[in-house]
Amino acid sequence: MRNILVLLLLLFLSPLSILFCQKKDDSVLSFVLYQGEDFCVPSDTLFPNFLYQLNFEFPVKMHDEDILCKIQQQLIDSIFYGHYQTTSFDSVARLHGYRIDTILYSNTYLREVPDDRDEYFDYGNSDRIYFFHICGRTVYNQDSLYIVKYHYTEYKGGAHHHYGTHYLAFDTRTAECVHFLDVFGNEYVDHEKRMIYDIGSLVLSALYDKYPEIGSFTRWEEASFTIINDNLTLHYAHYILACWAMGEQDIEIPIDTAKLFLSPNWKHLFQ
């Protein structure tokens, strides 16, 4: 009964799309793709503007809350001080004329931000917000990567413009940032096709550091466009990607489908 009440409370409080997950157990990664819609939320809520979401979630239970807290703090630090790239985030934001007025994190606002942020972001428009959310986690055997996607989005007059996407991958055992990927794209790029390419590129390139036998970044580029061009549904394509990335051995995948994007060096992940 208590769980039901908690669920109802969460549903009541959240104005955003609901993510429905299928989980076999804590060790198995299930993948859910859902697309939010442009919508106007009541003015008395925390959400002051139109929000658009195209979210990818790898719902894997995080057992170590201390690690999660460390990762969250690193995310805040990286946004304001650019710890994980040579060109800091404030410079990138400045390039696009941004002021970071609000941070949306995993569908909730972060209230604790650096007091001196105006020193870094004193040049923007209050109608613009910086939006990022958890993209997902992928597990390979005993190694776990916590992957976070965030991007610059401008909201003006109900319209939104997407300027760039960034990814961080954290080792969930140490909270160490192990990989960073910049994806600056044209705002008119098909977002769905872009996301399957981006997340696949990150997963592969991050894992490639530890497991060179799984393939190359270039080969994944070819593979991702093969998936798109063969008109596989994004849900199915991402499900396959998630199973592959975590090294799932028990999943049944048609061999013809696997051949679309698996090099000979990758096939052992499905055997």
Tell me the role of every PLM-derived stretch.
Residues 1-27:
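Bacterial Sec-dependent N-terminal signal peptides
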Residues 21-271:
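Compositionally biased intrinsically disordered regions enriched in Thr/Gly
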